[in-house]
Amino acid sequence: MHVEDFTSAIHPRWQRYLQGKGELALTGHSLRLVNRDTNCDAYTNAQIDDYQGLSRRRFPWRPPLYLGLRARFSHPQAELCGTAGFGFWNDPFMMTGRRLPTLPQAIWFFFSS
């Protein structure tokens, strides 16, 4: 089993993908994916992944697998705008690489306002 606890550093396997006012913050016991001072008119993203630059057939995670985490938002739902989520997907919309578009294959936990 692979365990990543982010207590001291972000392992080099994790590539950072930050847009707009997205930030990664190590707290000493966790990793926070932060979108600071944003509004509903601008895209922002704080992400780690391990598939940038890989062909889909080389993506590292395959079933069966287990993902355990603790997640929370810093504001009440009524103050959030946009989308947020975490999980596994096949990057169907070419967000982080030069791949042809494809149908989504995902297990994703998702928030949308």
Write out the residue ranges for each language-model feature:
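Secretory/extracellular carbohydrate-interaction modules
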Residues: 32-113
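Extracellular carbohydrate-recognition regions
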Residues: 1-21, 27
